[in-house]
Design a protein with these regions (language model features):
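C-terminal scaffold of the Radical SAM
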Residues: 2-5, 25-49, 54-321
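Conserved N-terminal Rossmann-fold NAD(P)-binding element of oxidoreductases
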Residues: 9
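Local cysteine-cluster metal-coordination motifs and their immediate loop/turn environment
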Residues: 12-25
Length: 321
């Protein structure tokens, strides 16, 4: 039997870019959405014959902000994938969203399109902390978005939180975690803030802005592990916690070195014994796909011995090891 396959689709568009973000994402390029959709559909169709023997058990649409891209475009993408790929009936289909770009109407469109898991970027329940990292949603919008998700029929909601934010204290972090728990998600991802080179946050730190140090971050992390365990969200990976049966199947495939195919600028793939990524340039990606040009940024064949080593190291990220 062929290995099961995951599909990742990168949506690089955002309403506003956060100060800490190092992912390939763009604000102010909405004029390219239609052409990008055309390129994505073309790329997905071109690749389908290569994956025809592989059952697809996870689909993940990340960004950027997929919910800002529009539910109707996402529905079209998923429709083509279901038509051309062997998507299993119980496949996990995740869409990332921000609280300010969803409502019941758009979420119902996604639910009817087969999306069965939402990953929402909450980050903090503190308005001042959100403003300091240039997040444009409010804590109240998180509440409204979570309610909208339930009304739309979603029963698998994940919330992303960040600890170590500028000005964050143990008390404010505890408030954020408790707020998140009050929304009764099925999954929580809690990430330590990383200052990535080239981001506005890195420039602020270089100019003297002080962040919680490593010891403070460690205290926040250890408290989180204990609190979420007691709340019924056992840890299954360094940054991830879930109610039983709700671990992210797509993210697990990365840590278990299972095959996946990516689409979009900056997207990575590990398929057919080869690991490769596409150019981190929206216009170059669109032009390359639609005009038959080269869109590969990096590509390598991974020797079996190296794969074994990677498997062991990545497994160490998980609680099972």
């Amino acid at each position: 039997m062929a290995d099961k396959l995951g599909i990742y689709i990168h949506i690089p568009f955002c309403r506003s870019k956060c100060d800490y973000c190092d992912f390939y994402s763009l604000a102010g390029r909405d004029d390219r959405m239609d052409q990008y959709q055309k390129a994505l559909l073309s790329h997905i169709k071109e690749t389908a014959p290569l994956a025809q023997d592989f059952p697809v058990d996870t689909i993940y649409i990340g960004g950027g902000t997929p919910s800002y891209y529009g539910a109707k475009r996402l529905k079209e993408l998923l429709g083509v994938i279901r038509k051309l790929y062997k998507v299993e009936k119980d496949a996990e289909v995740t869409v990332e969203c921000n609280p300010d770009s969803v409502d019941v109407k758009s979420l119902k469109i996604l639910r009817k399109a087969g999306v069965n898991r939402l990953s929402m970027g909450m980050q903090s329940a503190n308005a001042c902390e959100l403003e300091r990292i240039h997040r444009i949603h409010t804590p109240q919008q998180v509440n409204e978005a979570a309610t909208a998700a339930r009304k739309a029929g979603f029963t698998n909601l994940s919330l992303d939180l960040i600890y170590g934010l500028p000005g964050q204290t143990m008390d404010s972090w505890k408030d954020t975690v408790e707020h998140a728990l009050s929304l009764i998600p099925q999954h929580l991802s809690c990430y330590g803030l990383k200052v990535e080179e080239g981001t506005p946050l890195a420039a602020r730190v270089a100019q003297g802005e002080v962040l919680p140090d490593d010891d403070q971050q460690a205290d926040l992390y250890l408290w989180t592990v204990g609190r979420l365990e007691r709340a019924g969200y056992p840890q299954y990976e360094i940054s991830n916690f879930a109610k039983p049966g709700f671990a992210s199947r797509h993210n697990l495939r990365y840590w278990l070195t299972q095959p996946y195919i990516g689409f979009g600028p900056g997207a990575h793939s590990d398929f057919g014994g080869r690991r490769y990524s596409f150019v981190r340039d929206l216009d170059a990606y669109i032009q390359g796909v639609l005009q038959g040009g080269d869109i590969i940024d990096e590509s390598e064949i991974i020797p079996k011995r190296e794969r074994c080593g990677e498997y062991l190291m990545l497994r160490l990220r998980t609680v099972q090891g």
